């Protein structure tokens, strides 16, 4: 029985070890507001199928709602502007859980200076498959090259490849309501 408990605990710790740490000293209230998509990298099949050089940038708005973070994301599709709203449960400031149709998700804010950039890590557990997406946002629709280089270095550290990376060149045309 003790052996089974030890295996379960080790499995749980391994699952948690796959997540990067939340940015130290994160001030959640300073994260709220509008963020423009600058770049993203993902091993998700759906992302890789949709990825193109002229993929329009998403716009994300973070807001606090009864102590939980809400994410409203809008993006342009062939059918016009689409919006996805997600109410996330706070695990700790900067670490959130939420459910998707595809599986359980966790989002972590790994870096931000609050005024210019924000880097977000999302992990989706879809059965046995793990889907990882890292996104770079800016308060404006452009960022200095050093911030983009930092993001490109970070995606390699979490096991993503250059082929799984996209830099949004088309400016955002949809803003969440």
From Swiss-Prot:
Subcellular localization: Secreted
Record GO terms (molecular function): small molecule binding
This protein's record includes keyword Hydrolase: no
Family annotation (InterPro entries): A1-microglobln, Calycin, Lipocalin, Lipocalin_CS, Lipocln_cytosolic_FA-bd_dom
Top-level taxon: Eukaryota
Family recorded in the similarity comment: Belongs to the calycin superfamily. Lipocalin family.
Protein name: Olfactory protein
Species the sequence originates in: Lithobates pipiens
């Amino acid at each position: 029985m003790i052996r089974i408990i030890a295996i379960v605990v080790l499995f749980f710790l391994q699952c948690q070890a796959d997540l990067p740490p939340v940015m130290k000293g994160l001030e959640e209230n300073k994260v709220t507001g509008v963020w423009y998509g600058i770049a993203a990298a993902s091993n998700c099949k759906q992302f890789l199928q949709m990825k193109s050089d002229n993929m329009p940038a998403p716009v994300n708005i973070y807001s606090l709602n009864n102590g939980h973070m809400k994410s409203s994301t809008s993006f342009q599709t062939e059918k016009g502007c689409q919006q996805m709203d997600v109410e996330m449960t706070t695990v700790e400031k900067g670490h959130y859980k939420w459910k998707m149709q595809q599986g359980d998700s966790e989002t972590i804010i790994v870096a931000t200076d609050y005024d210019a950039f924000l880097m977000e890590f999302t992990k989706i557990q879809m059965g046995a498959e793990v889907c990882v997406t890292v996104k770079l946002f800016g308060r404006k629709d452009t960022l200095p090259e050093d911030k983009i280089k930092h993001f490109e270095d970070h995606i390699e550290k979490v096991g993503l490849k250059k082929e799984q990376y996209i830099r949004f060149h088309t400016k955002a045309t949809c803003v969440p309501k």
